[in-house]
């Protein structure tokens, strides 16, 4: 049962439930004791000149069903949560049942994962069964953000290339899946200088990747880029140690528009990948990490 703001609401709901059950029982008893009238046994209402409503008591089988329903409700509310904040004698919760089912499923799958957990990513990438399991894990847990083809979208990284903010080794990928990542670029406008300086730095950043830019503005922004170099490096190639982006390639996680660069410098950006350790076992993460690693390796081989 969901938590209430205070115990008063719990008592209120529980009271209504108990009163309703008692009311049903009283109505059933009163209706069952009604006797058939000796004369015409009608309610006295007449429709269409001669259509009358009989006033017979409830059939015994129907009254029996009502009694069974009330008894079931009493037993259910005693065993399971449903009477206000009362947890029931079985202390059952849907969360607990789900956790138990997950543990049971993991125990059943443990022998299957046991043969994979000691293998490196290179070996798993060549194992069709391991890759099939990894693909299903990806579809259930990763595709919602990164896409069914793992190519991502604006704000969600493409996992099939070799542009890794935090590293693309199997161990780094597992680390990312397990603990998640928080990418945080603070607003830098104040550190860069004037609004014109922000525009110039944006032009310089565009020039690093060979994107269309204003050459004069880019040269003016080069000196101001020094405040960005603390994270992105003096050459703009980024640093995986802090998860900063490589500004010299043609991969732009949040888009390439010039105005977009202005916004990033002015407002900063926070991107979060949630941790999956609570959803996946270490063995599952090992296989899933190998599958994700294989996606970029396939892309690299194809590019060659």
Swiss-Prot record:
Subunit-level organization: Component of the cbb3-type cytochrome c oxidase at least composed of CcoN, CcoO, CcoQ and CcoP.
Positions annotated to bind heme c 1: 142, 145-146, 273
Key word Transport present: yes
NCBIfam families listed in its UniProt record: ccoP
Transmembrane domains' residue ranges: 11-31, 61-81
A biological process term (GO) from this entry: proton transmembrane transport
Name of the featured protein: Cbb3-type cytochrome c oxidase subunit CcoP
Subcellular location: Cell inner membrane
GO molecular function annotations of the record: electron transfer activity; heme binding; iron ion binding; oxidoreductase activity
Cofactor detail note: Binds 2 heme C groups per subunit.
Recorded family membership: Belongs to the CcoP / FixP family.
Role played: C-type cytochrome. Part of the cbb3-type cytochrome c oxidase complex. CcoP subunit is required for transferring electrons from donor cytochrome c via its heme groups to CcoO subunit. From there, electrons are shuttled to the catalytic binuclear center of CcoN subunit where oxygen reduction takes place. The complex also functions as a proton pump.
Keyword Membrane set for record: yes
The protein's annotated pathway: Energy metabolism; oxidative phosphorylation
Keyword vocabulary terms for this entry: Cell inner membrane, Cell membrane, Electron transport, Heme, Hydrogen ion transport, Ion transport, Iron, Membrane, Metal-binding, Oxidoreductase, Repeat, Respiratory chain, Transmembrane, Transmembrane helix, Transport
Domain Cytochrome c: 129-209, 216-296
Pfam families: Cytochrome_CBB3 (PF13442), FixP_N (PF14715)
GO cellular component: plasma membrane
Topology term for the membrane: Multi-pass membrane protein
Natural source organism: Rubrivivax gelatinosus (Rhodocyclus gelatinosus)
């Amino acid at each position: 049962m969901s938590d209430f703001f205070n115990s008063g609401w719990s008592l209120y709901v529980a009271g209504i439930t108990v009163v309703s059950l008692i009311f049903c029982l009283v109505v059933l008893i009163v209706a069952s004791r009604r006797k058939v009238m000796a004369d015409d046994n009608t309610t006295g209402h007449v429709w269409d000149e001669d259509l009358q409503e009989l006033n017979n008591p409830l059939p015994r089988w129907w009254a029996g069903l009502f009694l069974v329903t009330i008894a079931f409700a009493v037993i259910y509310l005693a065993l399971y949560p449903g009477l206000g904040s009362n947890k029931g004698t079985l202390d059952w919760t849907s969360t607990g049942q789900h956790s138990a089912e997950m543990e049971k499923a993991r125990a059943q799958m443990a022998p299957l994962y046991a043969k994979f957990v000691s293998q490196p990513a290179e070996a798993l990438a060549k194992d069709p069964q391991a890759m099939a399991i990894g693909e299903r894990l990806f579809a259930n847990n990763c595709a919602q953000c990164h896409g069914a083809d793992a190519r991502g979208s604006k704000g969600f990284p493409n996992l099939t290339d070799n542009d890794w903010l935090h590293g693309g080794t199997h161990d780094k990928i597992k680390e990312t899946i397990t603990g998640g990542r928080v990418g945080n670029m603070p607003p830098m406008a104040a550190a860069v200088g004037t609004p014109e300086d922000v525009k110039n730095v944006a032009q310089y950043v565009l020039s690093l990747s060979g994107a269309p830019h204003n050459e004069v503005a880019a040269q003016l922004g080069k000196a101001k880029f020094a405040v960005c170099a603390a994270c992105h490096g003096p050459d703009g190639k980024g640093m995986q140690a802090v998860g900063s982006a490589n500004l010299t390639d043609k991969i732009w996680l949040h888009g390439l528009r010039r105005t977009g660069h202005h916004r990033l410098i002015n407002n900063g950006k926070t991107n979060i990948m949630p941790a999956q350790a609570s959803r996946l076992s270490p063995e599952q993460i090992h296989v899933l990490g190998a599958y994700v690693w294989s996606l970029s390796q396939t892309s690299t081989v194809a590019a060659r």
